[in-house]
C-alpha cells in the first residue's frame, strides 16, 4: 500500500467521522441550550448570600434541564429574618417562582448550604420528606443537625430533570367532560 493511498484513506475516514463528531457536539449544545434559567435575587438575604450561591451551585452541578443564577428580572427571591416556628421555608409555586425565607435561628443550628439547597428544591418542585435519611436533601431538618449533605440524591435529581425536561411542565390534570 502506498503512502498516497494510506493518506487518502485516512482523509476519507476523517471526512466520514467529522460530521458524527460535529453532530454529537451540536446535540450537547442544543441540550444545554434547552435548559431553563431561573433568575434569583439574594438582595433580601445579604448575610447568607454565599450560602445561597453555594446551594444554587449544588443544583446547577447536579441537573441539566434547569439552571439557577442571579440575574435581572428575578422570579425567585431569598430573604432573611426570624420566622419562629415556621423556620426557613419556601412560598413557591414549584415552578421557579416565589420567595424563600431563610431563618436566622435555623442557620445558626443546621448546615447553611443544606438549608438553602433544600429550600431551593421546593422552588424547583420537590416536596419535604422529613422521614428520609441525610442522603436525601429533601429530608431537611428531619435528618438532624449533624447532617451536612447539601446535594440532591439520584431520585431527587431525576425528579427535577423529568419535571423540567421542557422548561417546567405543569402537573397533568385529567377531567371527564360529559
Q: Over which residues does each language-model region extend?
A:
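Catalytic zinc-binding patch centered on the HExxH motif and its immediate surroundings
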Residues: 29, 77-101
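A short alpha-helix/helix-coil micro-patch that ends at or immediately precedes a cysteine
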Residues: 39-68
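Short pre-active-site segment immediately N-terminal to the catalytic Zn-binding motif
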Residues: 100-117
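The catalytic-center signature of Zn2+-dependent metalloproteases
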Residues: 110, 123-169
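Acidic/histidine-rich, surface-exposed loop or edge segments in extracytoplasmic proteins
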Residues: 32-44, 95-102, 140-141
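Active-site recognition of the HExxH zinc-binding catalytic motif
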Residues: 59, 114-128
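Secretory targeting and sorting signals
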Residues: 1-27
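Surface-exposed patches in mature extracellular/periplasmic domains of secreted proteins
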Residues: 63-73, 127-133, 171-175
